[in-house]
Amino acid sequence: MATAPDEARFLDLLDGTRELAALPGEAARLGIGPERVGELLEELLACNALDDSAAHRPLLALPPEERARLAPDLAALSLARPGPGAAPAALLARREARVEVRGAGRVGAAVASLLAAAGVGRVRVRDAGRVRPEDASPAGLRPDDAGRLRTDAAKAAVRRAAPWRPDETAAAQGLPDLVVVAPRGLPDPEHGQALVQAGLPHLYAGVVETTGSVGPLVLPGSSPCGRCLSCRRAEEDPSWPLLLAQHCSGRAAPGACDATLAATVASTAALHALIYLDGAAPPSLGGWVDISMVDGSMRRRPLDPHPDCGCCWQPGAQ
């Protein structure tokens, strides 16, 4: 917007050190009336150029190293959520969020690390057994983690990603705001029924041979679930139930899981999780995203509640 020299000097005063009520007096000394002050502020607000400095003050409670580490994330949030005070509020909300990741393979451990790196304060990883060499990935477990308990190795990976996050014990207290189901292999939709019955939002992520999938994001009772997706896949591919059984059989041999595809799935799943935690709807809500290792394509596929599932039936419906 075009401004006169006096108005330009007034804009210089909007540096976060003055309360809103003090601005008319400051503007009067520059020869600018209160009506024009209101017009300027409305124009700035309309183009998302104003922020609320008071909303940033709670961030001062974070360790200086953590504030510096999260500065790029805060800057990105200010572009995605440009309202006054919206970005710091979203970052602080992430700090209080609880996420449980089920699975510490190439996808799951990386999802947990990325969420912690993005400011999620309470990230817990659940998996059984010990780390195998093929579980290692740049964003998750390390090659020298082989032989360690998966939960211990995943906890260390999360701590490396965010050294100044809250104590891990806080992650185990209370129900999670989101569960990410990312086992080593294909997620079994039947295991997700307990999450549906408990009313816990959850997001599926995994790799099957040369295809990675993110979704659906399940909001129990209001969006299609993993069983809906399994029914849909079985309709499209009659061999799907057999493939699912093979991947969920606990076989000892490593399954196909390209490192770059796993990293892409993990980063996409983490992004979808953050979009949900930040209060918006990611593409995996009411659908899922397939990612091809063969040609690098990403395709969102819509998903409706399946009539053979019943997860979205209303009480009393027949």
Q: Where in this protein do the model-derived segments appear?
A:
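Adenine nucleotide-associated cytosolic modules
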Residues: 1-318
